[in-house]
Amino acid sequence: MARDTAILRVTGFVQGVGFRYTTKHVAYKYDISGTVKNLDDGSVEIHAIAEEENLNKFIDAIKKGPSPGCRIEHVYIYKGAPVEDRKTFDIVY
């Protein structure tokens, strides 16, 4: 099956609350490869690659807020965006 890509930019109270750590666990659940990192503006950026169905489930989970302490304001989704092909899902520091 073909793998789809997406870049997500998540705004709100998403840094310092375990968001990247729990996002990594959600990525494992849906067989997502890619990265998650904090941005200087307080948002989080996620690069994701997976089969379409799993990618959509992952995006839905992110919209709900994977970390209990986070408060999501908005999730900007750029499907089909160029993403580095990876075998794992990693937190970028």
Curated annotation (Swiss-Prot):
Cite the active-site annotation: 20, 38
Q: Name one GO molecular function term.
A: acylphosphatase activity
Under the heading InterPro entries, the entry gives: Acylphosphatase, Acylphosphatase-like_dom, Acylphosphatase-like_dom_sf, Acylphosphatase_CS
UniProt-listed Gene3D superfamilies: 3.30.70.100
- E.C. numbers: 3.6.1.7
Source domain of life: Bacteria
Residue intervals of the Acylphosphatase-like domain: 5-93
Q: Which cysteines are joined by disulfide bonds?
A: none
Q: What is this protein called?
A: Acylphosphatase
